[in-house]
């Protein structure tokens, strides 16, 4: 199992590395046993959307291990784009950022189980 750690909270995560995985994201999926989805990408401006998603989510942009932008409670299938700069994006079930007080400036640590690298 892979995890991300923000503050003192550990979240199980599914790591998305390929362009195909990035394009699929949470489309047509539920959280089904994971706390988050971690998108590892080249640091630059990225745009995420919730088209074809069936669950609301929080979208968090991360750069150099720090949270730089937070979009809480993104409506599924809204057609809206969520833009930010970063080398990673983390998607959480809606209200996670409020429940765990996740804000810009916090450190994000990715822990990968050796069998999943």
What are the residue ranges of the model-derived segments?
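Compact, glycine-rich, soluble single-domain proteins
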Residues: 1-117
């Amino acid at each position: 199992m892979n995890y991300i750690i923000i503050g003192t909270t550990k979240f199980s995560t599914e790591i998305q590395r390929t362009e195909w995985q990035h394009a699929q994201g949470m489309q047509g999926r539920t959280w089904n046993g994971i706390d988050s989805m971690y998108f590892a990408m080249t640091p630059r401006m990225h745009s995420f959307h919730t088209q074809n998603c069936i669950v609301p989510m929080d979208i968090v942009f991360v750069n150099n291990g720090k949270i730089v932008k937070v979009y809480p409670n993104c409506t599924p299938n809204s057609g809206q784009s969520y833009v930010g700069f970063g080398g990673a994006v983390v998607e959480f079930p809606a209200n996670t950022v409020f429940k765990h007080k996740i804000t810009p400036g916090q450190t994000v640590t990715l822990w990968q189980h050796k069998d999943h690298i």
